[in-house]
């Protein structure tokens, strides 16, 4: 299976709030083992570039270094790629990108806008609920968060407006594929399409999903959302999308639960989608969307990446994982 967006690596760097794991290579290898045991053979590690939380900013260099060194030294079983999630509302984003944008393992870059009141966080109460409970964002409770939200709103809109064209130019000149993140309205999708972007990652509304498909963009939806029958942040239900029109969903992403990818394939089976079509959402379609033509299906002269899966109490259990024809798990 091919995973285009997972931030699972971050969990191994911050296993508990404010507890940073000191050995970055060990954290990256632990993540790789979890990824492979979940049946993922090609993984795009989603790295948040530009952020407001000090703890996530503090591990950025170590996270990027861990993947880079792990790749250079051949330490991983899965094929890892860097997927930069660019927070356009961060006024310091361009300075951060200047330091990290030349990494040879960057394959995908998403343009994200987490301005309070916009896109995923158009419901500010949900943003407060998501961030306000954890010490990663504020150590002074909800009142401090409200004050910070007001300040962020004032600066974030200006930063997003400045950053979007410049960041797009950076990736276009480097020939890095771009995705639009958390599209909410037709206007968001239209803007992305005009910018040459053909991947809509985690569109948050039915309106955005339909517009993306109308413009022949590839839609990436969250597998955890599909398995749970709802979004963790009140976005459109992927289960409802599938029931409404299976063709609205091109690609599944495990996002924050690696095992959700294989579970989604078999949930589709239970809904009457045949195995070939359901498997495409985690194999051929993601590979094709990012130009990985050597994988995604089993053919002569392509990588022999495949799984053996059994069922235990109606749950898919990954028994064996093969990468390039060699068993790795």
For every predicted segment, state its role.
Residues 82, 177-293, 313:
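Active-site-adjacent C-terminal substructures of enzyme catalytic domains
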């Amino acid at each position: 299976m091919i995973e285009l967006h997972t931030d699972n690596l971050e969990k191994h760097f911050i296993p508990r709030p404010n507890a940073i794991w000191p050995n970055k290579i060990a954290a990256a290898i632990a993540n790789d083992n979890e990824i492979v045991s979940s049946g993922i053979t090609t993984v795009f590690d989603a790295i948040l570039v530009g952020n407001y939380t000090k703890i996530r900013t503090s591990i950025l260099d170590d996270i990027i270094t861990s993947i880079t060194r792990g790749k250079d030294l051949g330490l991983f079983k899965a094929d890892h790629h860097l997927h930069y999630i660019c927070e356009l509302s961060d006024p310091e984003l361009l300075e951060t990108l200047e330091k990290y944008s030349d990494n040879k393992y960057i394959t995908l870059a998403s343009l994200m806008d987490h301005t309070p009141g916009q896109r995923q966080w158009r419901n500010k109460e949900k943003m407060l609920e998501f961030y306000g409970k954890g010490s990663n964002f504020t150590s002074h409770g909800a009142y401090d968060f409200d004050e910070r939200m007001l300040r962020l709103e004032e600066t974030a809109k200006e930063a997003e407006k400045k950053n979007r064209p410049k960041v797009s130019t950076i990736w276009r000149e480097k020939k890095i594929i771009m995705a639009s993140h958390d599209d909410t309205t037709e206007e968001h999708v239209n803007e992305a399409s005009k910018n040459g972007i053909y991947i809509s990652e985690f569109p948050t509304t039915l309106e955005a999903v339909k517009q993306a498909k109308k413009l022949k963009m590839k839609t990436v939806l969250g597998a955890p959302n599909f398995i749970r029958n709802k979004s963790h942040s009140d976005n459109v239900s992927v289960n409802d999308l599938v029931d409404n029109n299976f063709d609205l969903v091109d690609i599944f992403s495990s996002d924050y639960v690696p095992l959700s990818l294989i579970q989604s394939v078999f949930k589709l089976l239970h809904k009457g989608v045949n195995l070939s079509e359901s498997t495409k959402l985690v194999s051929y379609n993601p590979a094709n969307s990012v130009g990985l033509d050597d994988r995604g299906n089993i053919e002569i002269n392509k990588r022999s990446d495949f799984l053996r899966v059994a069922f235990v109490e109606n749950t898919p259990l990954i028994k064996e994982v093969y990468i390039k024809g060699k068993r790795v798990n």
